[in-house]
């Protein structure tokens, strides 16, 4: 008799995805982040569900309802901080996952890569809308500034912004619709993640060497289930250290002040995981130019596969590309730092230089290094 996990229509899908899945025998810990992102998503949906039971999406009571969750709801404080810091963990895993994809050439799976970019955009939209919900000062002004960027679109810009706001400023209608979207988008992310996995399993996983691993595969369970559980334990450890010891470390103190449309905070800035894109936006003096640069800073990932000039897939045996990759990482850290600084000298200049460096490395230097390394192989 056939094993039920191989014959049952539903269990068979799980079996082919997580148990009997043929996996390269040499994938490193950098391949853990996919499963960690899945765990983060489930954690965010669960904590978010419990928060939504007590939250009210009304400008008059939103701030009070979040305070009520922290003070009066059983374990409300831990649910709230797990949700807020869980988002930070989500983005740490996301950046690591995308970075691994770029380093090891996983972008050569075009469908998987493009759905990944779509997932990144959707997650960023979800996180932005979630940041507006507590209705603190930074929530309100962040929503005002970021939605206002759409007014840079010629001809339809102003009408589009007012349509999104549901009025002439960020108001009750805006908060209500942001809550509705923030609730539904994680489920769309879940569906996209399933499609992402579907396309990945069509081709099989990449591996650090970048070479085909058809001759050397091992079953996913128990080898990689155990390995993923180790990664999961470390993730939970980091998350709980944040939640229990310094829950407000990554937040903004201004968000503990209720939203006041008549009082602008001295420095309006988004959450830390958007600072690199915010720095690129601010580095261009023109409004439309800044918005385009902001979108392109993420959309540039879509052209990475087209700019691959090397005969090798990953960067494991490509020292020049490795140097450029880590320079790009350092540059992104610099942009993150600049995004949180006031708009004054020398930060403006540093931001502009870091933005130029960011686009130059990806669009110009990486393809050139690939060509140089191809020639070095002939020597």
UniProtKB/Swiss-Prot annotation:
This is Cytochrome b. A ubiquinone binds at residue 201. Component of the ubiquinol-cytochrome c reductase complex (complex III or cytochrome b-c1 complex) that is part of the mitochondrial respiratory chain. The b-c1 complex mediates electron transfer from ubiquinol to cytochrome c. Contributes to the generation of a proton gradient across the mitochondrial membrane that is then used for ATP synthesis. The chain crosses the membrane at residues 33-53, 77-98, 113-133, 178-198, 226-246, 288-308, 320-340, 347-367. It is a multi-pass membrane protein. It is found in: Mitochondrion inner membrane. It comes from Hyaena brunnea. Its cofactor is heme b. CDD domains: cytochrome_b_C, Cytochrome_b_N. Pfam families: Cytochrom_B_C, Cytochrome_B. The keyword Iron applies. Keywords: Electron transport, Heme, Iron, Membrane, Metal-binding, Mitochondrion, Mitochondrion inner membrane, Respiratory chain, Transmembrane, Transmembrane helix, Transport, Ubiquinone. The cytochrome bc1 complex contains 11 subunits: 3 respiratory subunits (MT-CYB, CYC1 and UQCRFS1), 2 core proteins (UQCRC1 and UQCRC2) and 6 low-molecular weight proteins (UQCRH/QCR6, UQCRB/QCR7, UQCRQ/QCR8, UQCR10/QCR9, UQCR11/QCR10 and a cleavage product of UQCRFS1). This cytochrome bc1 complex then forms a dimer.
